[in-house]
Amino acid sequence: MLQNSELLQEYLPIAIFFGIAVLVSGLIMILPNLLSTKKYNKDKLEPYECGFEPFSDARSKFDICFYLVAILFIIFDLEIAFLVPWAISLNTIGKIGFFSMMFFLFVLIIGFIYEWKKGALDW
């Protein structure tokens, strides 16, 4: 077991790196606002479309199907994020780990079939 001083010595470089990263990120976000000149006019507030006059308002509505596909993508992308570490450690986790992941996949497959049957994937 590591003592407090040893633990501090182990994690001090990580804490310093994290602190510097937060400081640099904050500076990168704040400095342009402080140093730039702010001259707003009608042309700068318009959306830019490759040098042409805008055809319509840039704030157009999207069909709900796009949001649904995005949410389904995130859910099944997270499935892959869980599957990769499981596949790497498959030899060491034994039967309990195997059947837990099979149950997890079963629940996801049931959810996918439900979405399919409800017509969420039909356009």
From Swiss-Prot:
GO terms for cellular component: NADH dehydrogenase complex; plasma membrane. The gene is nuoA. It is found in: Cell inner membrane. It comes from the Bacteria. It is an enzyme of class 7 (translocase). The keyword Transmembrane applies. Its EC number is 7.1.1.-. The chain crosses the membrane at residues 11-31, 64-84, 93-113. NDH-1 shuttles electrons from NADH, via FMN and iron-sulfur (Fe-S) centers, to quinones in the respiratory chain. The immediate electron acceptor for the enzyme in this species is believed to be ubiquinone. Couples the redox reaction to proton translocation (for every two electrons transferred, four hydrogen ions are translocated across the cytoplasmic membrane), and thus conserves the redox energy in a proton gradient. This is NADH-quinone oxidoreductase subunit A. It catalyses: a quinone + NADH + 5 H(+)(in) = a quinol + NAD(+) + 4 H(+)(out). InterPro entries: NAD(P)H_OxRDtase_bac/plastid, NADH_UbQ/plastoQ_OxRdtase_su3, NDAH_ubi_oxred_su3_sf. Keywords: Cell inner membrane, Cell membrane, Membrane, NAD, Quinone, Translocase, Transmembrane, Transmembrane helix, Transport, Ubiquinone. It comes from Rickettsia conorii (strain ATCC VR-613 / Malish 7). Gene3D superfamilies: NADH:ubiquinone/plastoquinone oxidoreductase, chain 3.
